[in-house]
From Swiss-Prot:
The lineage of its organism: Bacteria, Pseudomonadati, Aquificota, Aquificia, Aquificales. It comes from the Bacteria. This is Uncharacterized protein aq_919.
Length: 159
């Protein structure tokens, strides 16, 4: 029995009532096809994406040890299922988290990240240039695309 199983047993007892209340709800462990289907996040029933290290590690342990219940570090216990994400989906989530801090360089806001997407086939960033041209002149748009592609390259490298 691993230390994680012991912790899960302890937490299951502690959250016995919560476990009963949430048994009909199922979380989804999202698997990264580019990383041998390793868990990269847990999708909650309400749509919240949990990619913190404890949630992910508990999900990995559940899969490795065939645990039936995943214990949320923030409360509750859930049945679980798995889903293989699109290629580059995990990397794109990390990219958006990182990109937020650089948007101010271009006088853009976090909401403007909606104008960037990715191709699951090629792994390249896709820009909604029509919308971005409303906010940036041609020179700044080109600088923005170069910078974001540089960041995207780094994210794919380190993840």
């Amino acid at each position: 029995m691993s230390k994680y199983s012991f912790i899960n047993i302890h937490l299951k007892r502690r959250f016995k009532r919560l476990e009963y209340l949430s048994m009909e709800k199922t979380v989804t462990f999202l698997l990264n096809p580019l990383k041998n289907n390793k868990v990269w996040a847990v999708l909650m029933p309400d749509g919240e994406l949990m990619d913190d290290i404890v949630s992910v590690k508990r999900a990995q342990t559940c899969m490795e040890e065939n645990e039936q219940i995943w214990v949320n570090p923030f409360g509750g216990a859930y049945m679980w299922d798995t889903k293989v994400s699109e290629p580059y989906e995990a990397e794109f989530v990390l990219f958006k988290k990182e990109a937020v801090q650089y948007m101010c360089i271009f006088n853009l806001h976090e909401a403007d990240l909606q104008y960037i997407d990715y191709s699951p086939i090629s792994g390249e960033l896709l820009f909604d240039e029509e919308e971005l041209k409303k906010k940036l002149d041609e020179k700044t748009l080109n600088e923005f695309k170069i910078f974001m592609n540089e960041l995207w390259g780094y994210i794919k490298e380190v993840s």
